[in-house]
Every structure is written in structure tokens, then in C-alpha cells.
Amino acid sequence: MVEAILRSTLGARTTVMAALSYLSVLCFVPLLVDRDDEFVYFHAKQGLVIWMWGVLALFALHVPVLGKWIFGFSSMGVLVFSLLGLVSVVFQRAWKLPVVSWVADRI
């Protein structure tokens, strides 16, 4: 599917829109604006899953004692996966991030 997209066919707009997918709440911009582009849509779905994970991590702060630990580890995971997603966009690849892509495929 996405692997069939060649590097030379991706323009600057596509790269910027795909990169926005991994910047927190800005993941909604590519989902709403550039839904027809398969490369952007792939990254937008993964970015949406990462954003939802971050929002759920905030709710973990309400759990006594363990909430701070859960939030800390989840925040690190969100940061790492967002950076990996941005790197894959810069290299113009469609890397399936572990667990994130599994959830994104079911959206």
C-alpha cells in the first residue's frame, strides 16, 4: 500500500503535512485537509494514535501513587514514537511503528 510510493513523487507539501501528524493535536490538520494522499493519511492515523496515548496518559495522573510513574513512562513513549514518526517522514518512508500501527490499522 504505502510502500509503493516512490520518494521522488513526494513533494514539500506532502512532507510537511505528514510531519504535522506527529506534533500533538496538529495531527487533525492532515486528517481533515489531506485525506486523499495515502502517505499523509498513513502518518496522520499513527499520529492520532500517539496523541490519544498522550491524552490517556494525562488521566493516569489521577491514579494515586502510580499515576506519576505511568504518566512519566507514557510521556517518554509518546516522545519516542513521535520522534520516530518524524524521522520516518524526513526519510520519506512509511515505517509501521510497533503497537501504534496495529491500533492505527483498526481506526
From Swiss-Prot:
Q: What happens when the gene is disrupted?
A: Intermediate magnetic response, slightly smaller magnetosomes. Double mamF-mmsF and double mms6-mmsF deletions have a normal magnetic response, slightly smaller, fewer magnetosomes. Deletion of the 4 gene operon (mms6, mmsF, mms36 and mms48) gives an intermediate magnetic response with fewer, smaller magnetosomes in irregular pseudo-chains.
Q: What induces it?
A: Part of the probable mms6 operon.
Q: Which residues lie on this side of the membrane: Lumenal?
A: 35-46, 91-107
Q: Does the keyword Membrane apply?
A: yes
Q: What are the subcellular locations of this protein?
A: Magnetosome membrane
Annotated membrane-spanning segments are 14-34, 47-67, 70-90
Cytoplasmic compartment segments? 1-13, 68-69
Provide the topology term for how it sits in the membrane.
Multi-pass membrane protein
Q: Which domain of life is it from?
A: Bacteria
Q: In the UniProt record, which is one GO cellular component term?
A: magnetosome membrane
Q: Provide the alphabetized UniProt keywords.
A: Biomineralization, Magnetosome, Membrane, Transmembrane, Transmembrane helix
Is the Transmembrane keyword given for this protein? Answer: yes
Its UniProt miscellaneous note says: This bacteria makes up to 60 cubo-octahedral magnetosomes of about 45 nm in diameter which contain membrane-bound crystals of magnetite (Fe(3)O(4)).
Q: Which family does it belong to?
A: Belongs to the magnetosome MamF/MmsF protein family.
Physiological role: Plays a role in regulating magnetite crystal size; partially redundant function with MamF.
Q: What is this protein called?
A: Magnetosome protein MmsF
